[in-house]
From Swiss-Prot:
The gene is Mefv. It holds the Pfam family PYRIN. Residues 126-142, 165-176, 183-208, 321-340 have a biased composition (Polar residues). The B box-type zinc finger interacts, possibly intramolecularly, with the pyrin domain; this may be an autoinhibitory mechanism released by PSTPIP1 binding. It is found in: Cytoplasm, Cytoskeleton; Cell projection, Ruffle; Cell projection, Lamellipodium; Cytoplasm. This is Pyrin. Phosphorylation at Ser-241 is required for the interaction with 14-3-3 proteins and down-regulation of pyrin pro-inflammatory activity. GO terms for molecular function: actin binding; zinc ion binding. Residues 94-219, 311-346, 697-719 are annotated as: Disordered. Zn(2+) binds at residues 444, 447, 467, 473. Residues 481-510 form a coiled coil. The modification Phosphoserine is found at residue 241.
Length: 767
């Protein structure tokens, strides 16, 4: 998962040492903020740890401004490497804002010079080699590893004056100021002679610092390992990793070590080194093809005698170098991992690794140096463990969590080799004692400086020794907190095992329940299909019956229309006959007597029965249609009522689902609707009105008509179904269409809700 700005901010704060972290909080309180931002209350920051402080920064200022503010404070407190790492981690899009917020506080990497120029030896002293010496060291060209070109191309002039000899001899310093940019200038030979050794040491220190930066040196924590120091005759300290073994002309061993030089071409793409030995002195010159005059540096023989036989200019990466003899007996170097032996780094843009190994001397792990961290002043000495500078606020306080020196205090072999490690180890031993002191353990809130060493079983809380003697815990079961913790851990383990077993049991039953649920769902789907198919068929049947019934009604309407047209035709013929006889009556005698017999015959043939006669078949069709419509109406009503009652659940069904027996009131209270199906052919003889019994404790149903009292009410019969759970009464009323003496009750069939057997031949006697 990608890290956010808050994650990078928290990682940076966690990498700060305790003293640096307190210094960071102090600087944060005194830093001016942008408009619209308020300072974090001092009470919140006093006891805040990195996690709490990161959350306060994000809460008060937001992620982006919190990162910019952190970069500003880190640079102000000389934590340049952490600031650079945070800037790279948060991306380059904040670079412009960082420069605007930080103001004059800029990264040390951006302020470093394009190259390190070492003053060359004057032409009269070091540019000419001694012709009497035949074993002059050959110059070799070092391969320069291609590092990331992240340095600024601009060079800035240093505002400080020349460094003193003491400040130049401080090795592995963390510089906060940009490197010097050498300009053209003249210097007397005497001054050059006196400061040559110091200048070489200072430039070698700068080269080693840049080497660690450009060769992917480890992080800040790894760069704080111990550095082995040696004392020079002048009383100054020097890291052993910066020592270069040199020999005079008389005492030079057969396999003399080479100090190669690099010379850059005029286009600035190649750097070379060259070394010359003149009059028992070794002069290392760095030349750069820019046309700018360069100063010289001379190392005297006395200084070289006090140096060790090894040199390491990179922090933790060792460059194994194997030496082979060529045909002339001079040493040759075999380069490994793109690094070449050398003594001085001439260009910070192109890192150079130098690892020298004597032919007959085994490697000593203590001689491997650690690359100094960037961000401190170049002219001040730094403790290899705690990185404390001279004049720092901490003084002699060592804040390193562990000492990386392998030499224990009091070791006779350590005399003259690593004196500063004794001080660090003493401070670390004191810090170890403080870590094991009672103050690091939880203290009693009631009794100050009393550690909670006991545990009260009755109150289930940790207590101190004074609490144990108090009246509150008198007579209670008290044990050491370690024993109680072991017992409770065992109880927690047992509960975890029990809960895990329970979880497995529940999971197993859940799987079984899921299987049963799937079966129920399948059965439900099957029942749905079983019900849907008959209902669909019934719906299709009803549609066909509806079409048939509508067709019959249309035919009947057409028949009635024909009867009416026939009646109108006969009436019109009668009117014509009347008009013809009236006209015949007003004619003269001679005209009247013509066709008089035919006219009278036609008049006599007209009769009322012929005019009012209905066409044959119409009456039968009307009667049959009436019967069918009445039957359909009754059957549809019965079917709808029966379907509604079948879909309703009784109290006994609900009680059966809940696993209990229904009460008598519930059984008698829910009486389903009773249905009676009559033959459609006899609907004219009698009309049956059927009413359900009133529900117990409820009102009479409103969906049915009230019983209509009849003159001759038949006897009341109670009918019970097979399961003897339903009881109902029926009231029947007849509407005879003929004489009372001919009343007859046709055979009717009763059908119960639960498909009980039909009860035919229910004959009701009349009073």
């Amino acid at each position: 998962m990608a890290k956010t700005l808050g994650d990078h901010l928290l990682n940076t704060l966690e990498e700060l040492l305790p003293y640096d972290f307190e210094k960071f909080k102090f600087k944060l309180q005194n830093t001016s903020l942008e408009k619209g931002h308020s300072k974090i209350p001092r009470g919140h920051m006093q006891m805040a740890r990195p996690v709490k402080l990161a959350s306060l920064l994000i809460t008060y200022y937001g992620e982006e401004y919190a990162v910019r503010l952190t970069l500003q404070i880190l640079r102000a407190t000389n934590q340049r490497q952490l600031a650079e790492e945070l800037r790279k981690a948060t991306g380059t899009e904040h670079l412009i804002e960082e420069n605007r917020v930080g103001g004059s506080v800029q990264s040390s990497v951006e302020n470093k010079a394009k190259s390190v120029k070492v003053p060359d030896v004057p032409e009269g002293d070091g540019t000419q080699q001694n012709n009497d010496e035949s074993d002059t060291l050959p110059s070799s060209q070092a391969e320069v590893g291609k590092g990331p070109q992240k340095k600024s191309l601009t060079k800035r002039k240093d505002q400080r004056g020349p460094e003193s000899l003491d400040s130049q001899t401080k090795p592995w310093t963390r510089s906060t100021a940009p490197l010097y940019r050498r300009t053209q200038g003249t210097q007397s030979p005497g001054d050059k002679e006196s400061t040559a050794s110091a200048q070489l040491r200072r430039n070698v220190s700068s080269a080693g610092r840049l080497q660690g930066l450009y060769n992917n040196a480890p992080g800040r924590r790894e760069s704080k390992k111990a550095e082995v120091y040696v004392y020079l005759p002048s009383g100054k300290k020097r890291p052993r990793s910066l020592e270069i073994t040199t020999y005079s002309r008389e005492g030079e061993p057969p396999n003399s070590e080479v100090l190669p030089t690099q010379e850059e071409t005029r286009n600035g793409s190649l750097i070379r080194m060259r070394t010359a030995t003149l009059n028992g002195r070794t002069t290392g010159a760095l030349e750069k093809g820019t046309g700018i005059p360069e100063h010289s540096m001379v190392l005297d023989e006395k200084t070289f005698r006090n140096m060790s036989s090894k040199t390491s200019l990179i922090g933790e990466e060792r460059c194994p170098t194997s030496w082979t003899e060529n045909g002339n007996g001079s040493p040759e170097t075999t380069e490994s991992s793109g690094e070449t032996a050398g003594s001085i780094l001439s260009d910070p843009e192109v890192p150079l690794s130098l690892c020298e190994k004597p032919a007959k001397t085994p490697e000593d792990p203590a001689s491997l140096g650690q690359a100094a961290c960037e961000g401190r002043s170049q002219d001040k000495a730094v403790c290899p463990l705690c990185h404390t500078q001279e004049g720092d606020l901490r003084g002699d306080t060592c804040v390193q969590s562990s000492c990386s020196c392998s030499i224990a205090p009091g070791d006779p072999k350590a005399s003259g080799r690593c004196s500063i490690c004794f001080q660090c180890q003493g401070l670390l031993a004191r810090k170890s004692c403080e870590a094991q002191s009672p103050q690091s353990l939880p203290q009693c809130p009631r009794h100050m400086k009393q550690v909670l060493l006991l545990f009260c079983e009755d109150h289930r809380e940790p207590i101190c020794l004074i609490c144990r003697l108090s009246l509150e815990h008198q007579g209670h079961r008290v044990r050491p907190i370690e024993e109680a913790a072991l017992e409770y851990k065992e109880q927690i383990r047992e509960q975890l095992e029990r809960l895990r077993e329970m979880r497995g049991y529940v999971e197993e039953h859940r799987l079984q329940g899921d299987k049963k649920t799937d079966d129920f769902l399948k059965q439900t789907e099957i029942q749905k299909q079983k019900i849907s198919c008959p209902l669909e068929k019934l719906y299709q049947l009803l549609e066909k019956q509806e079409q048939l019934f509508v067709t019959w009604l249309q035919e009947l309407s057409q028949t009635i229309s024909k009867v009416r047209e026939t009646y109108y035709t006969r009436v019109s013929l009668l009117d014509e006959m009347i008009e013809e006889l009236e006209a015949k009556q007003d004619q003269p005698e001679w005209d009247l007597m013509q066709d008089i017999g035919i006219t009278l015959h036609r008049a006599k043939m007209m009769s009322a029965s012929e005019l009012l006669d209905t066409p044959p078949g119409v009456k039968e069709k009307l009667h049959l249609l009436y019967q069918k419509s009445k039957s359909v109406e009754k059957n549809m009503q019965c079917f709808s009522e029966m379907l509604s009652s079948e879909m309703a659940f009784s109290a006994s069904d609900v009680a059966k689902w809940e696993g209990r027996q229904p009460s008598a009131t519930q059984v008698q209270g829910l009486v389903p609707t009773v249905h009676l199906k009559c033959d459609g052919a006899h609907t004219q003889d009698c009309d049956v009105v059927f009413y359900p019994e009133r529900e117990a404790g409820g009102s009479e149903p409103k969906d049915y008509l009230h019983p209509q009292p009849a003159q001759d009410t038949p006897e009341l019969h109670e009918i019970h179904s097979r399961n003897n759970k339903r009881k109902f009464k029926s009231f029947l009323k007849w509407k005879p269409s003929f004489s009372r003496t001919d009343w007859r009750l046709r055979t009717c069939c009763y059908r119960d809700l639960d498909q009980a057997a039909a009860h035919p031949n229910l004959i009701f006697s009349m009073i």
